Amino acid sequence: MKKNHIKTAILAMATMILTACNTNTTSNSSDKPEEAKKTENRFVTKNGTQFIKDGKSYRYIGTNLWYASVLASTGEGGDRERFCKELDNLKAIGVNNLRILSGPDAGSDLANPAKPYLQKAPGVLNDTILEGLDFAIAELEKRDMTAVIYLNNAWDWSGGFGFYLKECGYGDSPNTNEDGGYNRYVDYCANFARDQKALDMYYSYIKQIVSRKNSITGRYYKDEPSIMSWQLCNEPRPFSKENKESFAKWIADAAALIKSIDSNHLVSTGSEGKFGCEWDIELYEKIHADKNIDYLTIHIWPVNWGWAKRTDPDSDIEYACEESGAYIQEHQAIAKKINKPLVIEEFGFSRKGNASGTGIPTESRDKFYSFIFSCVEKNRHLIKDSKTGETHTEEGALAGCNFWGWAGSGRPRDLVWQPGDDYLCDPPHEPQGWYSVFDCDTTTIDIIKKYAKEINR
């Protein structure tokens, strides 16, 4: 999700009711040939514009749960009981895919970054959070769920570009809340794709994560069937028109590196679409046509992008859906052209009055969710053979979507997140409860369940 700076009231915290889950696991070593063979057919692969899992077309409704590795840990911020309960609740409503962050990097205090950190200094990783990632991967497998794991962030709420640039002598990432701060942040982040030292540190991190052996399952990550895709970054951008060539080279080099370590799993960019490519659809096509990028991604944020007024987003819901539909169609045309699947891996709409917290009406959000889900659901067509009269299903390029995001039993306590607060899907610097879906958002959950039945079959 992107940087945003709205100040809004947060409602009081409600009590979480947690239930236990079994954390005992059996060690399985993928060093054994029979284990490797056993998991081989369970990887998510692609065939043209379709994903394939267990020998069948794989389409899904997923969600974003960036905080998974921290919540699934046993250290600061960890709550395995809640984590397992969230997975159970998501599975029950038909959500089968999670998009998660590998773990936060040390970030600028000006950004109110997510804590605790996985990467405290270049190459220095927090074993507790790594074990949380191990646990998350293992628990997803138990429930036949999959994960997209992103390895970096263009935004400094989890360190990201700012972590590497600070280590290269550029200082802390600029405070975007100050006058002119956003433009300074953009100029600052443009250095990432063209600074070889920063890139080399990032590549070293990729090697550490992707080549890891899971302490719970005993498998190397490359052999974990619950990992669907490694993702280069959350919302990577060139951050300047002059930076497009360096940006495209970075995307290609990072994807090739991951494939050299792990040829079993898909690789994706994490791009927002042309919005994240300086509105250059040709650049978007170029980076996704790369042989090591397996599918296309887009994000859709009507309120953040000005397709709905911040003061009254509900009044613009029809226009927001219209613009979103056009955005989807433009990128789906690219997906068909280069013969790869497309996923809307982030989308969201705020509550009534652009407020945040629980108990606030979600009528417009529900309409927006229904619109996005229907785009995925209608992407499957029943085709009748004119000669034989037999029918078969033909899939379009739009293969899945992940709403932003799941808070479940978590509840907001402060205006912005503070250590000790529940993790929600709203990043720490944003109003807590702004885009999150809580387990008490019954109308939204009913819509998710309804469309999941159609899309998942």
Describe every region a protein language model picked out:
Residues 1-10:
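Bacterial N-terminal signal peptides that target proteins for export
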Residues 18-20:
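C-terminal motif of bacterial Sec signal peptides marking the signal peptidase cleavage site
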Residues 22-29:
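Bacterial lipoprotein signal-peptidase II cleavage site
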Residues 32-34:
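Carbohydrate-interacting/catalytic domains
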Residues 38-308, 315-341, 347-376, 380-455:
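Active-site mouth of glycoside hydrolases
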